[in-house]
Amino acid sequence: MAVTVTNQSNPLGSKIVQDTGATNSAVDNTTGGSGTLYMVEIDNSSYSTAVYFKLANTADATAGGASGTAATLVLFCPASSKRSYVFPEGIAFSAGFSHWCVTGAAEASTAAPATPPTVRYVTS
């Protein structure tokens, strides 16, 4: 899993977070603080099972399980597909951005994708 964050120049003033191997392990506080989410792209084109990308409004998440962090946002991507979700008005995250990816929609789901998708999201 490789996670990169790219700062964008004005007038955007935003960040692009890219995780080239999103798994069931939470990646915490990717942007280093609060912000607004504007777009998420999930590239699951190399995997034959659907995935659920989960984002939590926290700087310290625990992915899935009985004591897992509840996701603020859950986005579905079908098998062998790429999906983009755009939020023109943005979704505010006051505590930070933490994410993980699993094969089940349930909050307690912990099953990792056999082939992790690449996920990108744009924040301010």
Predicted features and spans:
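C-terminal interaction-tip segments
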Residues: A2-G32, T103-S124
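Asparagine-centered strand-capping/turn motif at beta-strand->loop junctions
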Residues: N29-T30, I42-S46
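Short beta-strand/loop motifs in extracellular/secreted proteins, especially
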Residues: Y38, T49-F53, P117
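Short coil/turn motif common to extracellular beta-sandwich-like domains
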Residues: G33-L37
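Short proline/glycine- and polar residue-rich coil/turn motifs
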Residues: L75-S81
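Short, surface-exposed beta-strand/strand-loop-strand elements in extracellular ectodomains
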Residues: S46-T69
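Noncatalytic modules at the cell exterior or secretory-pathway interfaces
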Residues: Y38-V40, G90-S109
